[in-house]
């Protein structure tokens, strides 16, 4: 949402006697006296982040720095909350966040359970620096951040920097890669360990669910559909977020 990243300045009648500049609050209704001769200027906000003021659980999306070219590329708060609940985070152990992006899931898990060892993996250039900055904002420290394609890691069997996961989040990759991850890491996981897979493509659910069950995971499937309110002239309307399926497997 742009209002989380920019201030909106309404400039009216520029160069004329009635020139006026004012800051807009887009969470409220627009002023009724806006001149027809206007332009809106967006200025990027600079915020000071202090983890002292953050909630323990349910951190707002705007706290996380995201990719400059994809500012909305993160797991939204409403979905992230459910993923963290489904992970049943232990006090101690190892969690892998594959397709970590800006690190929102793994880092919030680490804030909830500081004694966990977090391993973040994402292939996108710049993801490591992004996760490091967000870890500073949240006041947590991942054990290891790998800016690499998980396929390359699994194909070369270069798993020496990693510890066996007790909790595994598999996001940000296609069905074939998800299946390969399950096949490769299943032998590393023990009774009680949990995998959570966010899915937006309904067609992939059946095969992933069957693969987990073949590996002796007990599965559960939830659909997360949320709406956010937007202010309009008449009051308010609800804007739907993209629906997300959460497939959970418990060993």
Say what each PLM segment does.
Residues 92-101:
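Conserved class I S-adenosyl-L-methionine
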Residues 175-184:
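A short, conserved alpha-helix within the catalytic core of class I
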Residues 102-114:
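Conserved SAM-binding loop of SAM-dependent methyltransferases across substrates and taxa
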Residues 115-119:
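Short beta-strand element of Class I
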Residues 184-245:
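C-terminal substrate-binding/active-site "lid" region of AdoMet-derived donor-dependent transferases
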Residues 121-165:
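S-adenosyl-L-methionine
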Residues 74-91:
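Conserved alpha-helix/loop element of class I SAM-dependent methyltransferases that forms part
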Residues 1-70:
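A contiguous loop/helix-start segment that scaffolds small-molecule binding in enzyme catalytic cores
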């Amino acid at each position: 949402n742009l209002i989380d990243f920019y201030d909106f300045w309404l400039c009216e009648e520029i160069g004329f006697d009635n020139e006026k500049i004012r800051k807009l609050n887009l969470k409220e209704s627009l002023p009724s006296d806006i001149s027809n001769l206007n332009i809106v200027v967006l200025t990027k906000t600079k915020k000071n982040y202090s983890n002292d003021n953050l909630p323990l659980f349910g951190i707002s999306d705007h706290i996380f720095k995201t990719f400059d070219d994809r500012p909305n590329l993160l797991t939204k708060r409403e979905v992230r909350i459910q993923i963290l609940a489904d992970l049943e985070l232990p006090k101690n152990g190892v969690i892998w966040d594959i397709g970590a992006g800006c690190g929102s899931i793994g880092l919030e898990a680490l804030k909830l359970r500081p004694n966990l060892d977090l391993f973040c993996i994402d292939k996108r250039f710049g993801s490591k620096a992004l996760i490091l900055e967000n870890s500073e904002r949240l006041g947590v420290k991942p054990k290891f951040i790998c800016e690499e394609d998980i396929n390359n890691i699994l194909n070369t069997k270069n798993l020496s920097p990693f510890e066996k996961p007790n909790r595994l989040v598999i996001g940000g990759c296609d069905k074939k890669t998800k299946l390969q991850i399950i096949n490769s890491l299943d032998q590393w996981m023990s009774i009680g360990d949990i995998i959570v897979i966010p899915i937006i493509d309904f067609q992939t659910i059946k095969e992933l669910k069957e693969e987990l069950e073949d590996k002796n995971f007990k599965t559960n499937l939830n659909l997360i559909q949320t709406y956010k309110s937007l202010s309009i002239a008449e009051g308010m309307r609800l804007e739907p977020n993209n629906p997300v399926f959460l497939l959970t497997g418990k060993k």
